[in-house]
Amino acid sequence: MTGQILKDRHALVTGAGTGIGAAIATACAKAGARVSLAGRRRDPLAALQGKLGSAQTQVLTDFDVTDEEKVRAGIALARREFGPIDVLVNNAGEAPSAPFAKTDLATFNKALAVNVIGAFLVTREVVPDMIAKHAGRVINIASTAGLIGYAYVSAYVAAKHGVIGLTRALAIEFARSGITVNAVCPGFTETPLLDRAVDNIIAKTKRSRDDARATLAATNPQGRLVTPEEVADAVLWLASPGAHSITGQAIVVAGGEVMAG
């Protein structure tokens, strides 16, 4: 998708420093948006801003989506620099891996807090901007794990199902407010998160890195891993004027994985 389809719009992307978040922020900037890069670590955010330029982007560090006051302060700063928020991408996530019997409460709660509570807090703070304009896009980065089950990631699966539930509820609630709310559900994607999953497979099975990657790629009927840019393209489409009638949907970017299952 090309052209300045987001010109003069303000997009806020959480978890923007690396992986899918960085690809989404880059796509929004190339589409003409002013982009607030939100995250907890300054270095990757600053590096991305260096690539995209400071005129079109701002960095929101210490943006902990589970902390109500930090969310409120970060969004206030975003507004002061770039004005009301038109497009929100809730990308920040947490994906712990462990057998269910060894998953402690703290781990389970953290997955819910980052994935579900984070999307709730940030969306609640941003939505008044959209209601005032009678226009806005909320795009939640979920996962195929929000639609089907996977072993050894029960906390993540439960959390991503929650994200899709929140998406569907808000889509109905805001249907007459000019706001669309959708989820994008990537399959296994070439990101630092995937690298950690590969490391975990290697540690537990002693298999080679190539074999571990092949195992993850095999879940995709196309026989490959998804790229962050492919996920970003789906987000950009949902943020575009042409997607005004698309709301409450979970768009799968996984080469047919969920359909095949």
Give names to the regions the model predicted.
Residues S143:
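Residue(s) in the substrate-gating loop at a strand-loop-helix junction
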Residues G17-T18:
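Conserved glycine-rich cofactor-binding loop
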Residues A175, T180, I246-G248:
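Short, small/polar-rich loop/turn modules that mediate ligand/substrate recognition or access, typified
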Residues T2, I148, L236, T247-G261:
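Short C-terminal tail/terminal secondary-structure segment
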Residues P128, I172-E173, H244:
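Alpha-helical segment proximal to the catalytic Tyr-Lys
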Residues P99-F100, T107-L112, L216:
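Substrate-binding pocket helix/loop in short-chain dehydrogenase/reductase
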Residues T123, A159, T167:
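Active-site helix of classical SDR
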